[in-house]
Amino acid sequence: MARTKQTARKSTGGKAPRKQLATKAARKSTPSTCGVKPHRYRPGTVALREIRRYQKSTELLIRKLPFQRLVREIAQDFNTDLRFQSAAVGALQEASEAYLVGLLEDTNLCAIHAKRVTIMPKDIQLARRIRGERA
């Protein structure tokens, strides 16, 4: 009889069926205290969904008031009695978020170049160095 080559197949079934008697007896003797586990997505699924959602949207991602407080705190180092128009703070926030998004895109490319999917501080440093922002 000639030998035939075995090919790998995806399994369709799960575990083998258990005996019914043991499970029925166990169910009757102990009250069911544990509930059904809540549904959980696989790692990375929610992250990808968030990435797609934020790439579609155009709204600002940093909250306005915390950003405004940060701007005022930084400006106090230079001049104590500065006032800001709301449009000026809005323009600063737009520019800041655009800069951060671009930097994180370049950082992600640096991580991918290093055959990683996790960004690290050294990726940000490399991206800034290539851009010429930091020597």
Swiss-Prot record:
Record PTM 5-glutamyl serotonin, positions in chain: Q6
List of residues that carry N6-methyllysine: K5, K10, K19, K24, K28, K37, K56, K64, K122
Modified residue annotations for Phosphothreonine: T4, T7, T12, T80, T107
Residues with N6,N6-dimethyllysine modification: K5, K10, K28
Pfam family, one: Histone
SUPFAM superfamilies associated with the record: Histone-fold
Citrulline carried by residues: R3, R9, R18, R27
N6-succinyllysine: residues bearing it: K15, K56, K122
Tissue expression summary: Specifically expressed in the seminiferous tubules of testis.
Main localization, broad class: nucleus
N6-acetyllysine sites (modified residues): K5, K10, K15, K19, K24, K28, K56, K115, K122
Gene Ontology terms describing biological process: positive regulation of cell growth
UniProt-listed CDD domains: HFD_H3
GO cellular component terms given for this protein: euchromatin; nucleoplasm; nucleosome; nucleus
Compartments where found: Nucleus; Chromosome
Modified residues annotated as 5-glutamyl dopamine in this record: Q6
PTM remark: Acetylation is generally linked to gene activation. Acetylation on Lys-10 (H3K9ac) impairs methylation at Arg-9 (H3R8me2s). Acetylation on Lys-19 (H3K18ac) and Lys-24 (H3K24ac) favors methylation at Arg-18 (H3R17me). Acetylation at Lys-122 (H3K122ac) by EP300/p300 plays a central role in chromatin structure: localizes at the surface of the histone octamer and stimulates transcription, possibly by promoting nucleosome instability. Citrullination at Arg-9 (H3R8ci) and/or Arg-18 (H3R17ci) by PADI4 impairs methylation and represses transcription.
Region (Disordered): 1-41
N6,N6,N6-trimethyllysine found at: K5, K10, K28, K56
Keyword terms, alphabetized: Acetylation, ADP-ribosylation, Chromosome, Citrullination, DNA-binding, Hydroxylation, Methylation, Nucleosome core, Nucleus, Phosphoprotein, Ubl conjugation
Modified residues (Allysine): K5
Residues recorded with modification Phosphoserine: S11, S29, S32, S57, S86
Task performed by this protein: Core component of nucleosome. Nucleosomes wrap and compact DNA into chromatin, limiting DNA accessibility to the cellular machineries which require DNA as a template. Histones thereby play a central role in transcription regulation, DNA repair, DNA replication and chromosomal stability. DNA accessibility is regulated via a complex set of post-translational modifications of histones, also called histone code, and nucleosome remodeling. Hominid-specific H3.5/H3F3C preferentially colocalizes with euchromatin, and it is associated with actively transcribed genes.
Family statement drawn from the similarity comment of this UniProt entry: Belongs to the histone H3 family.
Subunit structure: The nucleosome is a histone octamer containing two molecules each of H2A, H2B, H3 and H4 assembled in one H3-H4 heterotetramer and two H2A-H2B heterodimers. The octamer wraps approximately 147 bp of DNA.
Name used for this protein in its record: Histone H3.3C
Source organism (scientific name): Homo sapiens
